């Protein structure tokens, strides 16, 4: 699987993502800087976590207006898979690639801990390595992960199976509506999620529950 990791000022999880993708796919991702307007032929584009542009204005608002985002939008329109984790999720929402909004955590505090996720839809290119309803462990680290959507949007994404992950009962760290932790677009090739699967891919790091997401994408390419 060929992949690319986007780099923007303030993102600080790019090295973790590069390490995870390299270990799982056997190929080191190319890195794409914010000013680039072309992205090479890849199977997966990842926008990692962090605090792009210091989270000024709104989380992801400035990053979503960088030149590289139009290239990502164009690739997504052609069916290339795009994954946004944490700040990457916020950027995808700000860019209009995913529905809804991400607000300040209900606690008004930065949350950094391990939580449990429930796989709501295991029939996608991002989740097929998991079982339907499987509960996995995954770390979170964010201040603005409270997912919100209006009633019409919420009904649509729930009805379409666009919600892939929910925080398991009693573990919602931010107040997200319907315990939503990860959402994909209607086409099924763009996923945004607040938890960090790249930080739980091998036993030496405490477990490998996050590996399934990347393995799913890899299996689609290999099929």
Curated annotation (Swiss-Prot):
Database matches in PROSITE patterns: GATASE_TYPE_1
Listed SMART domains: GATase_5 (SM01211)
Gene Ontology CC annotation, any one: cytoplasm
InterPro entries: Class_I_gatase-like, PRibForGlyAmidine_synth_PurQ
Catalyzed chemical reaction(s): N(2)-formyl-N(1)-(5-phospho-beta-D-ribosyl)glycinamide + L-glutamine + ATP + H2O = 2-formamido-N(1)-(5-O-phospho-beta-D-ribosyl)acetamidine + L-glutamate + ADP + phosphate + H(+); L-glutamine + H2O = L-glutamate + NH4(+)
Pathway participation: Purine metabolism; IMP biosynthesis via de novo pathway; 5-amino-1-(5-phospho-D-ribosyl)imidazole from N(2)-formyl-N(1)-(5-phospho-D-ribosyl)glycinamide: step 1/2
Gene3D superfamilies per UniProt: 3.40.50.880
Pfam families found in the cross-reference section: GATase_5 (PF13507)
Example GO biological process: 'de novo' IMP biosynthetic process
Subunit text: Part of the FGAM synthase complex composed of 1 PurL, 1 PurQ and 2 PurS subunits.
Entry annotation: catalytic residues: 86 (nucleophile), 196, 198
GO molecular function: ATP binding; glutaminase activity; phosphoribosylformylglycinamidine synthase activity
Record EC number: 6.3.5.3, 3.5.1.2
Domain of life according to the entry: Bacteria
Subcellular location: Cytoplasm
Free-text function comment from the UniProt entry: Part of the phosphoribosylformylglycinamidine synthase complex involved in the purines biosynthetic pathway. Catalyzes the ATP-dependent conversion of formylglycinamide ribonucleotide (FGAR) and glutamine to yield formylglycinamidine ribonucleotide (FGAM) and glutamate. The FGAM synthase complex is composed of three subunits. PurQ produces an ammonia molecule by converting glutamine to glutamate. PurL transfers the ammonia molecule to FGAR to form FGAM in an ATP-dependent manner.
Protein name as catalogued: Phosphoribosylformylglycinamidine synthase subunit PurQ
Keywords: ATP-binding, Cytoplasm, Glutamine amidotransferase, Hydrolase, Ligase, Nucleotide-binding, Purine biosynthesis
Source species of the chain: Rhizobium etli (strain ATCC 51251 / DSM 11541 / JCM 21823 / NBRC 15573 / CFN 42)
Domain (Glutamine amidotransferase type-1): residue spans on this chain: 3-223
